[in-house]
Amino acid sequence: MLGETMIGTGGVIPPPPEYWPMVCEICKANDVLVINDEVITGFGRAGTWFGFEQFGSDPDLITLAKGLSSGYLPLGAVGAKDHVFDAFLGGPGEAFMSGATYMGHPLCCAAGIANLEIVEREKLVERCAELGPYLQDGLGTLRSHAIVGDVRGVGLVAGIEYVKDKATREWFAPAQGVAAKIRDEAFQRGVFVRMLGGGHVHAVAPPFIISKEQIDTVVRVLDESIGVVEKQFGY
């Protein structure tokens, strides 16, 4: 069973609290491995070293990238529990022999080690845990807008979903470009947000070193930008 710990590109959608515990219980009862994709939530963004710690998952394997090297050089990895890792070991004729051309690339691995040393030394995971609620609470005030159907997230990653009708949760037609217009308004004011979820959601994922004052600026700019576009559509 392979799944993102929290849906990312699909719209920044955290799972219900009971989801991963139930998945793990069912899988382990049927001898099925659980694999969490931690490419987005790994290495601090969720407010813990790994996102599965936030959502009650107990994976056998995890996929890792992005935060492993902070993007300075391309680096990915797989983490495995002993009972999975040990299955690859053995003597001649027993070990699982496999390789890849760029596996264990020394330069990329050195960048990853240096990156993780900085994250640990500067306590950036703890910083995400501290600033995450501040970001989520600030963005939560945007729910007062008529076209904001949901604000959700964990740690220093959040999604803002735009809807035509809050009661029905109906989206705007893609051709109306509501999220794109808000993005452009925000960009003119110095804040960049990324469109996800089929163009109906903005992702807010600031760097770990963002300050509370800068978070206030992000919230203010998005509030202004949403207000401008709302008026254009008659709200």
Residue ranges and their predicted role:
Residues L2-Y235:
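Conserved N-terminal phosphate-binding loop of PLP-dependent enzymes in the Aspartate aminotransferase
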